[in-house]
Amino acid sequence: LDFNGGLMMLHYGNLQFTNATQLNDPFDCHPSLIDFSNVPKEACGGWTPEIIEELRRDPFRRTREEAWICSLSKIYDSILMWSYYSKHKGICIGLDMEKVRKSLSHMWGGTMIGCAEVEVQYKDIVEKPDYFRDAKDFFHYQISTKAKAWEHEQEVRLFILNPSPAYMALLPGQNDDKGPIDWKEVRAFPEIGGECFESVYLGINMDVEEKSKIIRVARKLNPDIKIFQMEIDANAFRLNTKLIE
């Protein structure tokens, strides 16, 4: 996360969910991950194969528009991810996933907040399954499959279908001055407990004042949170951590 994103996450104690159509990878959750073209005759029932193909594809198109995703990672020390997400000037936040799951599964304002969790699988597009012939959970496949180019991220996803407006919010700079905002551009920010925030990792190139702000806000959110400074390993191309007392 960059400084501002990390600061807001710690200040409000929430997670950010983004609509699948707004993710930075255009292949993400796309119906084209599944092959609908091999329509068997017995599936037509008097309709043309083209119509059946569209009818079967359409629910997956809607799923992509209705799914909001929170992208997490199993790792905190990827040089590549630190570089392209924040130029080593931001932070990485460690979560206690057992507590996150518990926090996201409760009643709030009469609305059940709950989300599903999937571990991303990385594949080549040529491996896409045949909808009519392969025995797969195609919904799970659509939500959890990404290109092998992303494999280094070791992503774990939380996702919500059609999140409640109660925890939707605009980002700074978003407004309706130029007309209505597309609902898919609005993020969901369900709140989780401070105990869910287990650790914070500070980037190597982080500004000193910004670092102090992060430490102060993190310890206010969870007095027991562990805070680490990322450091360069002098003997290898890797990052080390140093606990800040």
Where are these regions (language model features)?
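Partner-binding and oligomerization surfaces adjacent to conserved cores of proteins
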Residues: 1-245
